[in-house]
Design a protein with these regions (language model features):
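Eukaryotic tandem repeat interaction scaffolds
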Residues: 154-190
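Extracellular beta-strand-rich solenoid/capping regions of secreted or surface-exposed proteins
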Residues: 43, 55-70, 79-98, 106-118, ...
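Secretory targeting signatures
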Residues: 1-34, 50, 70, 122, ...
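Leucine-rich solenoid repeat scaffolds
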Residues: 209-256
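Consensus "Asn ladder" position of solenoid repeat domains
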Residues: 102-103, 125, 130, 147, ...
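Structural detector of coil-to-beta-strand junctions
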Residues: 60-62, 86-90, 111-113, 131-134, ...
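N-terminal domain-start segments of secreted/luminal proteins
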Residues: 31-61
Length: 256
């Protein structure tokens, strides 16, 4: 893809990484009680189950403790729009958090923001109309699996994170990228279907020792982009048996 588009994508992630912490802190100050039926702007912990759709003028739910489980239970959390500074579900400095569908998170700057947390699991959720569907910054051991992701601007983005596991997701029509890693290491993207993006999978030059394998990455402007063509031995990323047509550098697709 064109360098200007790639630069915009990385700049978007870096900007959200800087801004999201401020937005999150102001949101946490909005509410500190826990209700049986969660409401927009609520700080929640423990076992949380949606019993109705949430249409939020601000942030959706803010996790307030370790071992929290949010069950969307077939309902949706809808925000004020992707150009807002609002987040659907915020996971700030809380470990072993699970967000599970079926259910939908849509129309936020970030559908789910995970920051400073370990062991978050996002599973069987639909994301559409967000700037970034799932955004991780400063996390370890985040798992993103079996989700329907798209259309958004970016599907899954990891910034300054380690040991991310992105697998078995269907990503379609995420305009800038399906998966984007910025300064992210020792992570795996495997068995995903990714199409309809400027970049199917993008890794910047500071992301190393990652494994991309067994993915169907087709119908993108550039299916796989390792730091705009950086030689694979420089950042030691592995590309194994990916079904794709176009890559930079060449040779990361099956049969090329």
């Amino acid at each position: 893809m064109q360098r200007t588009t790639m630069s915009y994508m990385v700049a978007t992630i870096l900007t959200l990484a800087a801004v999201s912490g401020i937005s999150m802190q102001s949101s946490v100050q909005m509410a500190h009680a826990q209700l049986a039926s969660p409401a927009c702007g609520q700080v929640v912990k423990g076992n949380v189950t949606l019993t109705a759709n949430l249409n939020c003028p601000g942030d959706g739910l803010i996790v307030g403790g370790d071992n929290t489980r949010i069950d969307l239970n077939g309902y949706s959390i809808t925000g004020p729009g992707p150009d807002s500074s609002k987040v659907g579900i915020v996971v700030p400095n809380s470990d072993l958090v699970t967000v599970v569908g079926p259910g939908t998170v849509r129309n936020f700057q970030a559908g789910i923001l995970v920051t400073g947390s370990d062991g978050t699991n996002v599973k069987r959720v639909t994301f559409d109309g967000n700037k970034i569907a799932v955004f991780m910054t400063g996390t370890t051991n985040t798992v993103v699996e079996q989700n329907l992701i798209g259309p958004n601007s970016i599907g899954v983005a990891a910034h300054s994170s380690d040991m991310v596991d992105v697998h078995a997701n269907l990503m379609s029509s995420n305009s800038l990228a399906g998966v984007t890693f910025v300064n992210t290491d020792k992570s795996t993207v495997w068995a995903n279907s990714i199409g309809g993006s400027a970049n199917g999978i993008f890794l910047d030059s500071q992301s190393d020792k990652n494994s991309m394998k067994f993915n169907n990455v087709l119908g993108n402007t550039l299916d796989i982009n390792n730091a705009d063509g950086l030689a694979l031995n420089i950042n030691d990323n592995e590309f194994l048996k990916n079904n794709c047509n176009t890559s930079n550098p060449v040779g990361t697709c099956v049969g090329t």
